[in-house]
From Swiss-Prot:
<feature type="disulfide bond">
    <location>
        <begin position="54"/>
        <end position="60"/>
    </location>
</feature>
<keyword id="KW-1015">Disulfide bond</keyword>
<feature type="modified residue" description="Cysteine amide">
    <location>
        <position position="60"/>
    </location>
</feature>
<feature type="propeptide">
    <location>
        <begin position="64"/>
        <end position="171"/>
    </location>
</feature>
<keyword id="KW-0372">Hormone</keyword>
<keyword id="KW-0732">Signal</keyword>
<dbReference type="GO" id="GO:0005179">
    <property type="term" value="F:hormone activity"/>
</dbReference>
<keyword id="KW-0527">Neuropeptide</keyword>
<feature type="signal peptide">
    <location>
        <begin position="1"/>
        <end position="26"/>
    </location>
</feature>
<keyword id="KW-0027">Amidation</keyword>
<dbReference type="InterPro" id="IPR024276">
    <property type="entry name" value="CCAP"/>
</dbReference>
<dbReference type="GO" id="GO:0007218">
    <property type="term" value="P:neuropeptide signaling pathway"/>
</dbReference>
<keyword id="KW-0964">Secreted</keyword>
<comment type="function">
    <text>Cardioregulatory neurohormone that increases heart beat rate during adult wing inflation; has no effect on beat amplitude. The effect of CCAP is both ino- and chronotropic.</text>
</comment>
<feature type="region of interest" description="Disordered">
    <location>
        <begin position="116"/>
        <end position="171"/>
    </location>
</feature>
<feature type="propeptide">
    <location>
        <begin position="27"/>
        <end position="49"/>
    </location>
</feature>
<keyword id="KW-0165">Cleavage on pair of basic residues</keyword>
Amino acid sequence: MQMYHVVLGCSLAILLVILDIPQASCDDVVIQKRQVDPAEMDRLLDPKRKRPFCNAFTGCGKKRSDESMGTLVEMNSEPAVDDLSRQILSEVKLWEAIQEARVELLRRRQEQLQQQSNQFGAGMDRPLPLPIAGYRRKRFADPESQAPAPHSNLPRATSQLQEEITKPWSR
């Protein structure tokens, strides 16, 4: 019975808390506005004071408001155009050197492949020994059952090898 009173008391307390919450009004909660200094706001929004911009082409440390390649061309000044043309010319020369080195490497590789194919091609003129004939020769002890040499009468040698292979094993 006491458990019933505890559960009833807790339920009543929770009900009172839930019913009391809507009575709180927005006036009771005070929200303070932050004071913003106009000088600080101007400093934050000033386009000249942006953070440095980093990318793969220009690197880091240059501000976005600094002169870029586009503004150099717009200035129509002779030194800026000369600087830009020198930079483009050096990049073109570097690209050409890279391409020439690539062509040279491919040419050398092709020559090596041709030399290797010529070396292997020259060795293909002579007949290769048959490994089965050598194996059979070692296996059989008596000279009559040996297979003939690979360079003599090839069709007869292969037929004899086939006969030896198909013979039943006897001990």
